[in-house]
Swiss-Prot record:
The lineage of its organism: Bacteria, Pseudomonadati, Pseudomonadota, Betaproteobacteria, Burkholderiales. GO terms for cellular component: cytoplasm. Coiled coil: none annotated. HAMAP family: Dephospho_CoA_kinase. Pathway: Cofactor biosynthesis; coenzyme A biosynthesis; CoA from (R)-pantothenate: step 5/5. GO terms for molecular function: ATP binding; dephospho-CoA kinase activity. It catalyses: 3'-dephospho-CoA + ATP = ADP + CoA + H(+). It comes from Bordetella parapertussis (strain 12822 / ATCC BAA-587 / NCTC 13253). This is Dephospho-CoA kinase. ATP binds at residues 11-16. NCBIfam families: dephospho-CoA kinase. Gene3D superfamilies: P-loop containing nucleotide triphosphate hydrolases (3.40.50.300).
Length: 214
């Protein structure tokens, strides 16, 4: 199946684009949704997180205490690597299981840290970045989450620089503060139609999709 890696910084609007692609028939696998399920009450990652970080990492309902973890990572940057070492193998396993069951027109992996991980270039046929300026990111995240600007900037600092993401992109969807919902939809539709054509070509004899042996 033809594979798209969809990414973008926090607040860029990648989830909104992913929802549109799903509406039009793509199979969408969201790494963030998998991560949240793994760290929800009873989530598969929670026993290992509790062992690694202690009971203070677990909220009263049994989920990951995200505010506590954000504070820890700010004070001890190495804690991010410890958490990712627990989560990433599980996310990878669940991602592959979902991909094996996908039956859409093509497959979209929504991965916030796609560029940062360095593991996705060979797993997807194209990388698409949903892009906006930092001020727009901050405004959107403040509106939806109530996080302070310093907290948001810390999250942004842990992600790839905007220029780095754009350099890795095969396709870019601009979703800045001036982009209307209709314009965003039109931009996403243009790429959807392009990917459908590429998926069709890859499925023909002699066509090749990511992960296919030479």
């Amino acid at each position: 199946m033809y594979k798209i890696g969809l990414t973008g910084g926090i607040g860029s609007g990648k989830s909104r684009v992913a929802d549109m692609l799903a509406e039009w028939g793509a199979s969408v696998i969201d790494a963030d949704e998998i991560s949240h399920a793994l760290t929800a009450p009873g989530g598969a990652a929670m026993p290992a997180i509790a062992r690694e970080f202690g009971p203070q990492a677990v909220a009263a309902d049994g989920a990951l205490d995200r505010a506590w973890m954000r504070d820890l990572v700010f004070r001890e940057p190495a804690a991010r690597g410890r958490l990712e070492a627990l989560l990433h193998p599980l996310i990878g396993l669940h991602t592959e299981q979902a991909a094996a069951q996908a039956r859409g027109l093509y497959l979209v992996f929504v991965v916030p840290l796609l560029v940062e991980s360095g593991r996705w270039r060979g797993r997807v046929d194209r990388i698409c970045v949903v892009d906006c300026d930092p001020a727009t990111q901050i405004a959107r995240v403040q509106k939806r989450s109530g996080l302070t600007e310093p907290a948001i900037r810390r999250i942004m600092a842990a992600q790839a620089a905007r220029a780095t993401r754009l350099e890795a992109a095969d396709d870019v969807i601009v979703n800045d503060g001036a982009t209307s919902p209709d314009t965003l939809r039109a931009r996403a539709r243009t790429l959807h139609d392009r990917w459908l054509a590429l998926a069709g070509a890859a499925s023909q004899p002699g066509g090749k999709a990511a992960g296919t042996p030479e």
